[in-house]
Amino acid sequence: MTIALGKFTKDEKDLFDIMDDWLRRDRFVFVGWSGLLLFPCAYFALGGWFTGTTFVTSWYTHGLASSYLEGCNFLTAAVSTPANSLAHSLLLLWGPEAQGDFTRWCQLGGLWAFVALHGAFALIGFMLRQFELARSVQLRPYNAIAFSGPIAVFVSVFLIYPLGQSGWFFAPSFGVAAIFRFILFFQGFHNWTLNPFHMMGVAGVLGAALLCAIHGATVENTLFEDGDGANTFRAFNPTQAEETYSMVTANRFWSQIFGVAFSNKRWLHFFMLFVPVTGLWMSALGVVGLALNLRAYDFVSQEIRAAEDPEFETFYTKNILLNEGIRAWMAAQDQPHENLIFPEEVLPRGNAL
């Protein structure tokens, strides 16, 4: 008896095969299965943001003007978070809050929940798109892994942090000035700049910028002479098969500058991947900690001595006073529904006063 080994082929294509052929067809803009998640979610997230910043007020949720229609500009317009009283409601258009009324839904902050959720799924869809394309052209999936850093930051800041607090109200609104105010809030209420996870995030992002600048300059400096052109771009031939720069020369240069240098390209480029992605993940972990109200570094001995000795003050104790001022001002302004009134004697003052 003979057993034939071979690839099983179906006589005719089923619906899945037809869909797969169409979605993964070679075209100018790749769609793919990930596109079924990415494109609708990105469209709705961006559309919701443009709609909110153009037309929708924040009067009912924050007591603010936040749209172009009310006189804001690109830096001050925002899609604001729902009111504190709505807690963690999903704010569905057909839910008990809006009851199908689109105008009321916008007034309650429904667009923020809409943009945040669709934005998160759009980012995940973009990462899956990189996985799918990498698999199609037989690349390793490090682009997608790197993009997990921005996704982690977005999800931790816009979703996990407010879930740990009393409601979506305490998430950032989607706007430039709104994000700045959220950063001030993080500093005043969480002392974020003295949080070790924030420090690792700053080191990762700024370190990555430094690495990019050094790497780009080094490659430009060690390019081979490919032709008689007047500059790098005229002389460069995009179809040449050989390498365009000298790793040996670059290694020798940085060995003389620093005493150490990367010995091969794999280690160099992995390090350029590792530094920013690790920084972003550390920042995301720190924000998850803030969602649970974990504290940053506290130098209590300095605070006690500053309270006892009017002549003793450090940059740390000055910053603690500044944080108290931020809390005293922002709490009353951002949460008018709480009717917070601080008497003059509890407002922070420097030791000199």
UniProtKB/Swiss-Prot annotation:
GO aspect biological process, one term: photosynthetic electron transport in photosystem II
Annotated TM spans: 41-61, 125-141, 153-166, 208-228, 279-295
Modified residues (N-acetylthreonine): 2
Coiled coil (residue ranges): none
MF GO annotations: chlorophyll binding; electron transporter, transferring electrons within the cyclic electron transport pathway of photosynthesis activity; iron ion binding; mRNA binding; oxygen evolving activity
Positions carrying Phosphothreonine: 2
Pfam families noted in UniProt: Photo_RC (PF00124)
Reactions this protein catalyses: 2 a plastoquinone + 4 hnu + 2 H2O = 2 a plastoquinol + O2
Major enzyme class: oxidoreductase
Post-translational note: Phosphorylation occurs in normal plant growth light conditions. Rapid dephosphorylation occurs during heat shock.
UniProt-annotated binding residues for chlorophyll a PD2: 198
Textual note on the cofactor: The D1/D2 heterodimer binds P680, chlorophylls that are the primary electron donor of PSII, and subsequent electron acceptors. It shares a non-heme iron and each subunit binds pheophytin, quinone, additional chlorophylls, carotenoids and lipids. There is also a Cl(-1) ion associated with D1 and D2, which is required for oxygen evolution. The PSII complex binds additional chlorophylls, carotenoids and specific lipids.
Gene3D superfamilies for this protein: Photosystem II protein D1-like
Major site of localization recorded for this protein: plastid
Binding-site residues for Fe cation, renumbered to this chain: 215, 269
Family: Belongs to the reaction center PufL/M/PsbA/D family.
PANTHER family referenced in this protein's UniProt entry, alphabetically: PHOTOSYSTEM II D2 PROTEIN, PHOTOSYSTEM II PROTEIN D1
Subunit annotation: PSII is composed of 1 copy each of membrane proteins PsbA, PsbB, PsbC, PsbD, PsbE, PsbF, PsbH, PsbI, PsbJ, PsbK, PsbL, PsbM, PsbT, PsbX, PsbY, PsbZ, Psb30/Ycf12, at least 3 peripheral proteins of the oxygen-evolving complex and a large number of cofactors. It forms dimeric complexes. Interacts with PAM68.
Function: Photosystem II (PSII) is a light-driven water:plastoquinone oxidoreductase that uses light energy to abstract electrons from H(2)O, generating O(2) and a proton gradient subsequently used for ATP formation. It consists of a core antenna complex that captures photons, and an electron transfer chain that converts photonic excitation into a charge separation. The D1/D2 (PsbA/PsbD) reaction center heterodimer binds P680, the primary electron donor of PSII as well as several subsequent electron acceptors. D2 is needed for assembly of a stable PSII complex.
Name of the featured protein: Photosystem II D2 protein
Source organism phylogeny: Eukaryota, Viridiplantae, Streptophyta, Embryophyta, Tracheophyta
